[in-house]
Regions:
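RNA-binding accessory domains that recognize and position tRNA/RNA substrates
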Residues: 1-142, 154, 159-188, 192
Length: 192
């Protein structure tokens, strides 16, 4: 197996017309070999004009975090200490958070693969980077509930109904079972 010399969390790009977001990752190997991976999230139930209503200071850090968490799938295939981030920088505290999340989130993977993970994960940061102020995005009081197509989804939905909290379901690649749960509960399911 080729050993990666660097792993770059590349860019993310929103396509409002298609209500999709692509995330790019680049793995570099010796002798200039490169492999690029792309993840794409599609939000078929989100109208194109809604993307402009999300404040940039809310959307940008959200997509940056998504870029980093989705990248775990590629980084664990090509683990390297040389982690790079294109397009934005992290604070020391943010880097420590991502170090911890990757280390603890991949614990079973490291064990199963018999990998030495000591000092393997080190997200880059800039000392001068100041943590941004939390962005305000006032939204109506409501909830977004994962529709896992099982009894827990029904129970959670009933608890939200009982509390008077309006909600919608969301599901990744929904199946007929997801649709049935949504109909049973009487809630809209947003497809992702």
């Amino acid at each position: 197996m080729l050993r990666a010399s660097s792993f770059t969390f590349g860019i993310y790009k929103i396509n409002p017309a298609r209500s999709s977001i692509t995330f790019t990752y680049i793995v570099e190997f010796k002798f200039g070999l490169r492999k690029t991976f792309t993840d794409k999230l599609v939000f078929p139930d989100v109208a194109p004009e809604l993307w402009e209503k999300i404040p940039k200071d809310v959307l940008a850090p959200t997509l940056q975090a998504l870029l980093l968490i989705l990248g775990i799938n590629y980084w664990c295939v090509f683990p390297t200490k040389n982690i790079r981030i294109a397009g934005f920088t992290l604070t020391r505290e943010q880097a420590q958070f991502w170090d911890s999340l990757y280390l603890n989130g991949l614990g079973e993977f490291f064990y199963d693969m018999k990998m030495d993970f000591q000092d393997l994960i080190s997200f880059p940061y800039h000392e001068s980077k100041i943590a941004p102020e939390p962005a305000r995005f006032v939204r109506p009081a409501r909830a977004l509930l994962l529709n896992g197509a099982g009894k827990d989804s029904i129970l959670s939905a009933e608890l939200l109904k009982k509390s008077g909290t309006p909600f919608d379901f969301f599901a990744f690649a929904p199946t007929p079972a997801h649709k049935k749960i949504g109909e049973l509960v009487g809630a809209k399911t947003i497809r992702v």
